Curated annotation (Swiss-Prot):
Cited InterPro entries: Allophycocyanin_b, Globin-like_sf, Phycobilisome_asu/bsu, Phycobilisome_asu/bsu_sf
Record's subunit section: Heterodimer of an alpha and a beta chain.
GO CC term, one of those recorded: phycobilisome
Role of this protein: Light-harvesting photosynthetic bile pigment-protein from the phycobiliprotein complex. Allophycocyanin has a maximum absorption at approximately 650 nanometers.
Protein name in the entry: Allophycocyanin subunit beta-18
Keyword annotations: Antenna complex, Bile pigment, Chloroplast, Chromophore, Electron transport, Membrane, Methylation, Photosynthesis, Phycobilisome, Plastid, Thylakoid, Transport
Amino acid sequence: MQDAITAILNRYDLTGRYLDKAAVTQLESFFSSGLDRIKIAEIINNQATNILKEASAQLYEEQPELLRPGGNSYTTRRYAACLRDIEYYLRYTSYALIAGNTNILDQRVLNGLKDTYNSLSVPLAPTVRSIQLLQEIIEEELELQSITRKDIVQEPFQHLINALSEQDL
């Protein structure tokens, strides 16, 4: 896993350059958002169960066919696997959020996920929708707590959504 600082330093080290104004600006942005990153991670940590419960309830309300015979969440085992996966998305996005870098999402979530889901005939659209719901629920909570830095939340969630939505992975 890389954080934003390591990514910047590695990029400049590979080219043998000192940090320029662009690098310093990126570092300043990361450090200035640090307190908000911690607050958002605390919200996710403290409310993970409720966030997961609300996201799954909304998903199954919107797409009840997932719970019917033949649906990908039909049977207790499949339902539990779906909830487990939604929890993984939430947990790993919280790590990426703190790190200010989506590298961990590529390493631990995306590499092989799409192929695995396709081989098991797990539809990607409900997966993408569950990630969107997680993002929306967290953003609503940020509004309630007067935290305005939604971009911090959007970056890791949108990274997952965009990667899983691509046609040519």
